[in-house]
Amino acid sequence: MNNYRFPSNFTWGAATASYQIEGAWNADGKGESIWDRFAHTPGKITNGDTGDVACDHYHRYLEDIALMRQLGLKAYRFSVSWPRVLPTGFGRVNPAGLDFYDRLTD
């Protein structure tokens, strides 16, 4: 078996998708996403599983960031939950949603 090594200048990081990690599906003014609607429709998802809690990153982001530091990650790419920022898809912006992403990137 060959032994491969990453170059010393390789940047280790992580990436997440909002629906799969944030949870807090209806917290702080977040609107319903397409996935929320689909997952809450009876018979659509095995066992009725949803992303309602997921990893609870919305409430545990500080712990998650600490874990990333512990792992030595130098990069983090995440997706924005647009229903958290624009609950109806247009018009009024949700200040609590913006505040979450502000805290996450601070």
Predicted regions and their residues:
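Non-catalytic accessory regions flanking glycosidase/transglycosidase catalytic cores in CAZymes
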Residues: 1-106
